[in-house]
Regions:
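C-terminal segment of classical bacterial N-terminal signal peptides
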Residues: 17-25
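Membrane-embedded alpha-helical segments in integral membrane proteins
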Residues: 16-17, 51
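N-terminal export/targeting leaders of redox proteins
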Residues: 11-12, 20
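Bacterial N-terminal signal peptides that target proteins for export
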Residues: 1-11
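Extracellular, repeat-based ectodomains that mediate carbohydrate processing or recognition
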Residues: 26-318
Length: 318
């Protein structure tokens, strides 16, 4: 096949909690105010961001965020991943000034950084770093199921802050299991180092701020027209790699049906992941495979051998 890989970006620091006092939160902890309507992003000369949005109940919230940029590499589990501190009262928790947000001096210049998917706002801080807000439906059900719970359709607001190099998401399409099925494999790195966590639940949810899941969508497949969520996969330790084959699968417990879902290769694929620390979510998109791509199978296998070295979990899909 003709391998392609493209690096884009989105955000990765999610907003949490409803506390009045200052709190800390990891970059991958979702905001409790789902489906909020973004209003403004401001950044002052002290490195604080003020995010103003309207909650679904109509109430306006002024969120103060500070204390984090970029990400740490997962070299030592004892070293915490970077994360924002939040004051959901707009300054009362940090400064005991109820009007702090109203006199916030915005010094952020127009955004001139890399293109971001799902972006609703971005700007360039006085120190040259970037801040961004994006809105994303991360909780869609897997295996192409239509949402059946309100929270599955929720839009999350994500805040990010970074300078310099962005995370890199490599994704390649290939034929798996002797050419019977289409699949994707790839690797998530930051600053040349693999991104991974140190622990996860049995169903693949990270147990620390280092771990990340990639979310795979398929376009115009047997699931129906448009984009449908196929899978969510934990990136592997210590390689930062992942793989997925579009094969028939049995739905998860609690899904509306337990009938085996058909293989769902699509015309296009999309892979999205929240970057490490407070870096942006990044996204790759590429074309599905065709019969002509089989002629390049050997070259893609060579890429697999280079990218997936050390990943024993994915070896059967080589």
């Amino acid at each position: 096949m003709r391998p392609s890989h493209r690096v884009l970006t989105v955000t990765c620091a999610l907003l949490l909690a409803t506390a009045w006092l200052s709190s800390t939160a990891g970059a991958s902890e979702p905001l409790s105010d789902f489906n909020a309507t973004f209003q403004s992003l401001a950044v002052n000369s002290k490195g604080e961001a003020l995010v103003t949005y309207q909650r679904a109940d109509g109430k306006v919230r002024h969120l103060l965020a500070w204390g984090a940029v970029n990400a740490n590499a997962p070299t030592d589990q004892a070293v915490p991943q970077v994360h924002f501190k939040y004051d959901y009262s707009g300054g009362w928790g940090k400064y005991h000034k109820s009007s702090y947000w109203s006199s916030f001096a915005n010094k952020c210049a127009p955004y001139d950084g890399p293109a971001l998917p799902y972006v609703v706002a971005g700007c360039k801080a006085p120190d040259g770093s970037y801040w961004a807000i994006q809105s994303w439906q991360r909780a869609l059900p897997l295996l192409g199921f239509d949402p059946w719970k309100p929270q599955q359709t929720a839009f999350e607001l994500h805040l990010s802050h970074w300078s310099g190099e962005l995370p890199k998401l490599e994704v390649y399409g290939h034929w798996t299991y002797g050419g019977a099925w289409q699949g994707l494999f790839g690797r998530l790195t930051y600053g040349g180092s693999p991104v991974h966590g140190f622990g996860a639940t049995g169903d693949g949810n990270p147990l620390d701020r280092y771990g990340r899941n990639v979310y795979i969508d398929t376009f115009n497949s047997v699931y129906g027209a448009g984009w449908k969520r196929e899978s969510g996969i934990l990136v592997h330790k210590p390689t930062g790699t992942f793989c997925h084959s579009f094969v028939p699968q049995k739905p998860f417990p609690g899904y509306p049906s337990q009938e085996t879902r058909p293989a769902a290769p699509g015309e296009r694929y999309r892979v999205t992941v929240m970057g490490p620390g407070v870096t942006p979510v990044i996204q790759w998109e590429g074309a599905g495979l065709t019969a002509a791509d089989r002629q390049a199978a050997a070259s893609v296998t060579a890429i697999w051998d280079q990218v997936m070295t050390g990943d024993g979990k994915c070896a059967p899909e080589r």
